[in-house]
Amino acid sequence: MSLIEIEHVTFQYPGAAEPSLNDVSLNIEQGDFIAIMGGNGSGKTTLCKLLNGLIPHYYVGDITGAITVDEIKTLESKVTDLSRSVGYVYQDFENQLVRAKVIEDASYSPLNFGYHDYLERGKTALEKVGLIGKDEEYIWELSGGQKHLLALAGAISLEPKILIVDEPVAQLDPQHAKELYDVLKMLNEKENTTIIVIEHHTEFIAEYCKNVVLMSKSKIIWKKSVREGLTRVNELREKDIFPPQITQAAYSLTEKEDSTLPITLNEALEYFESYQAPEHNQIFLQQTVQKIKEKIVDIQNVDFSYKTISRQKKKILNGVNLTINKGDRIALVGNNGAGKSTLMRLMTGIEKPEKGEVLLKEMNTKEFSPEKFADMVTYIYQNPEEMFIDDSIKADIEYFLKARNVKDYAIAVDHIIELFQLREIKDRDGRLLSGGQQRRASLAIGVAMQPLLILLDEPTANLDIGTRKHISKFIQSLKDEAEAVIIATHDMQLVAEWANRIIVMKDGQIIHDGNRETVFSNKALLDQAGLTPPQIMEISRLLGMKLAYSVEDFVKYAENFGEESAYSGNYKEAARVY
């Protein structure tokens, strides 16, 4: 008998026109590490909520079929009966943190189940996820990555046989994402925990998982080994799922869809060995002529701190100097906790610097209220639903223009609705839209304010790859709607394709201000900041080729192999990547 058996399950939420799961069957064995792939709305999260009993015991609806988990028939059991067998880390993991201190939160589940050794169980869980020594810290003092690990510690404190993690890397920087997956790998290999991840990032699936399930339109299309699944390039693309970039590149060069295609970076080094460039001693970077530019924001020697619960100061920004100019398309990058979001809030006037000055069009933000700058700066939140205050998208877009008594605002609203392709959903409540639709609508609301400066916080977080590509096209158009645009993001592909300036932050300081050539060709800088370049860029660097910023770039350089222009002079690296 399999550890998990799902037999012909159909589930439909109340009021929904179509079922979220339609005749779904799936078996998962003990010790598997399996990824569930599919576009937004394909049924991935609904499928996983069957396994811990949240469906149908919390989220009600019409359900048929049978689900057996660790020999427990879930439709006939309680959620508490399944809690010892199934741990779950949700996509919005911060909502799982329910106690003030780290050790209290990690030991909360065993305490609720009456275990006398609940504190020891909590400490053991913290040790497994690498948070030992953080026991007495308050959860709001943790970075985003540490909070995710704490949610994971709480989920494994009951030592479940099955662990489900929804979108493990959606809100994490690359370094913390790898740390989280390394913990999952350890649990799988050392404790035989069955790991189920809902994942859009196929590079992580290739590196860590054993099997993969493809879902589309509420159905399971197939379950296959990772290698067999990720090399089905055409089928995945048809479902708006994108295989690893190196797999796409190899397929484009050979037009052969088989299991010999590389799916990891180490495999790609061997596969593309014949394309490796000769060694060179120098890295050649494009020289640009500096021009005098019009300043929009001038940040001068700024410090910023938050007060902790013990009334001590926690330094967030330290000695930051930065000028934002007209025409800048800036990517603000760095690990969780580097200070990116705080820096953007200072530009809005919502936060005031502890030391130094923030000048917006030569106006000191310390001397004016945030309302003074509302006409000049738009801040689009990481969670787009926070932008919706009315009962329709059109009303939300109109709101600011009406409040400012803008003449002929209806013409501007119509232009924005057309620009962001919102015509069909303009009368719907933004809070009820899909993730991609919400993001488009939030961008439209921001543009409607007609600002000089647009600030976006993680605009592609929590989106599947197909939707991310779609949203990226709309972000490209923002350069025509404002004098400057700044994006705080972990999405290095967006950075590589969109930004004309990249600012790298670490521990509250700016450690580099350059462009994609100066950032992505500098391995020491990438390591220092904990940044992971897009896979296709990394393989081109390791092969000594000119940096490829997209799969198309790599294929073009490879097809022109042998021509001097195909190489940047990057030194050859023979070492394998681990």
Predicted ranges, named:
Residues 117-134, 407-425:
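Conserved ABC ATPase "signature" region
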Residues 60-72, 356-364, 373:
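Conserved ABC transporter NBD signature motif
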Residues 163-166, 454-457:
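Catalytic Walker B motif of ABC-type/P-loop ATPase nucleotide-binding domains
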Residues 217-218, 507-508:
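Conserved ABC ATPase "signature" C-loop
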Residues 52, 348:
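Helix-to-loop junction immediately C-terminal to a conserved catalytic motif
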Residues 138-142, 146, 429-433:
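Conserved ABC ATPase signature
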Residues 37-39, 333-335:
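The feature captures the beta-strand-to-loop junction immediately N-terminal to the Walker
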